[in-house]
Structures are given as C-alpha cells and as structure tokens.
Amino acid sequence: MNENLFASFIAPTILGLPAAVLIILLPPLLIPTSKYLINNRLIATQQWLIQLTSKQMMTMHNAKGRTWSLMLMWLIIFIATTNLLGLLPHSFTPTTQLSMNLAMAIPLWAGAVTTGFRSKTKNALAHLLPQGTPTPLIPMLVIIETISLFIQPMALAVRLTANITAGHLLMHLIGSATLAMSTTNLPSTLIIFTVLILLTMLEIAVALIQAYVFTLLVSLYLHENT
C-alpha cells in the first residue's frame, strides 16, 4: 500500500485528542539533570555546549538583553531536540507545522519589539525611516519598513518550517525508492541506501543548524531593540 507523501506531517491523535501536546512536552524530559556535585560525561558535555552557545549569543547584548538568556537557551534546546526526535522513523515533528512555529516566533518577536518601543522609543521609530531619505519618499518608505517589521516573525516561522519539511520529504522519497528497488535491483538499492544514510547525517546537521538560526535571529531582533 502506498503511503501518502504528506502523511507524516499530519498531527497525530490519541482517542480523538491531539497528541502534539505530549510530543511537545517530551523534549524537556529527555534533557538529563544531575543532583550531584560531580557530573558524568554526558551532563558535563551538555553544560559545555549550553555555555558555549550562550556565550556566542549573549556577548553582543547589554544587561537588559542578557535577561533573556535563559529563554533563548530553552528555545534552542527545545527546537534542536524536537527536530532530532522527528528524524526517528514513524515519528512526528512539531516544527513542520507552521502554526506551532508562528506560536513561538510571534510572542518572542513581539516581546523584543515591545521592549524596544518601551526603552528606546525614538530609536525604535527611527528604524522605520532610513537616514537621508528624500522627502517625497518618506511616506512610502515608512510603509515599506513597517511591513518588513511585521513580516519578521512570519519569515522566522516559514524558514524553519520549509527547511525541516523539505528534508523530511526528501528522506521519505529516497526511502521509498530504496524499498521499491530492494527486490529488483540490488546494486542500485545499495547506492540509494548509502545516499539515504548521508542525507540522514545531513538532516541531523540541518536540525541543529535551524535551531541555532531561529534562536540567533530572535537574539538579533532583541539586540536591535535593547
């Protein structure tokens, strides 16, 4: 039986109730924590990665911007873990849903913009009008800059959705081709299976990179407004 190409992107249900909530709550449970003074290698590596990422993102921020550090670290860990779990066979990836990505992008973007308008109102308004703009073009440029400002959360969500969805579709197509040719052409099957393994490794990197890019862009929006 041929499976629908987009079947893996349909949110699963349990007894008619959406299971996406349980899937979203799963990543925090997989992050190991330690109650001991001496940590094992896994927790030590995890703490090192968190400190390295935090240093990369928060160096450019002032004291007000650094108050967001905990939220940004939670965001990158959540997205990365969710993306990696979605690479498991017969699993569901919440970040392929535009609605969920918008639910993450809009509040974070709105919080950063609101912070800018509250603390630096003049500077925030100055972003809507580039310096040296000719007087006849001022109304048009203000409208364009305002539209581009409101497009930012949509661009964040669409970028994450498109990259994760494209990778899953490509893996699904190559996996289906491998299965279909396994009984007819063994040499070609081995070649395609090797390509599938390489693509899976690439998708693991993409899952981590997209989590970093999403969080980094939120951090840049915050930096512009603090």
UniProtKB/Swiss-Prot annotation:
Its membrane topology: Multi-pass membrane protein
Assembly description: Component of the ATP synthase complex composed at least of ATP5F1A/subunit alpha, ATP5F1B/subunit beta, ATP5MC1/subunit c (homooctomer), MT-ATP6/subunit a, MT-ATP8/subunit 8, ATP5ME/subunit e, ATP5MF/subunit f, ATP5MG/subunit g, ATP5MK/subunit k, ATP5MJ/subunit j, ATP5F1C/subunit gamma, ATP5F1D/subunit delta, ATP5F1E/subunit epsilon, ATP5PF/subunit F6, ATP5PB/subunit b, ATP5PD/subunit d, ATP5PO/subunit OSCP.
GO-annotated biological processes: proton motive force-driven ATP synthesis; proton transmembrane transport
Reactions listed under catalytic activity: H(+)(in) = H(+)(out)
PANTHER family: ATP SYNTHASE SUBUNIT A
SUPFAM superfamilies membership: F1F0 ATP synthase subunit A
Protein name as it appears in the record: ATP synthase F(0) complex subunit a
Keywords: ATP synthesis, CF(0), Hydrogen ion transport, Ion transport, Membrane, Mitochondrion, Mitochondrion inner membrane, Transmembrane, Transmembrane helix, Transport
Alphabetical list of NCBIfam families matching this protein: ATP_synt_6_or_A (TIGR01131)
Record-level Gene Ontology MF annotations: proton channel activity
Provenance organism: Gorilla gorilla gorilla
Gene name per UniProt: MT-ATP6
Protein's job: Subunit a, of the mitochondrial membrane ATP synthase complex (F(1)F(0) ATP synthase or Complex V) that produces ATP from ADP in the presence of a proton gradient across the membrane which is generated by electron transport complexes of the respiratory chain. ATP synthase complex consist of a soluble F(1) head domain - the catalytic core - and a membrane F(1) domain - the membrane proton channel. These two domains are linked by a central stalk rotating inside the F(1) region and a stationary peripheral stalk.
Family membership: Belongs to the ATPase A chain family.
Pfam families tied to this protein: ATP-synt_A (PF00119)
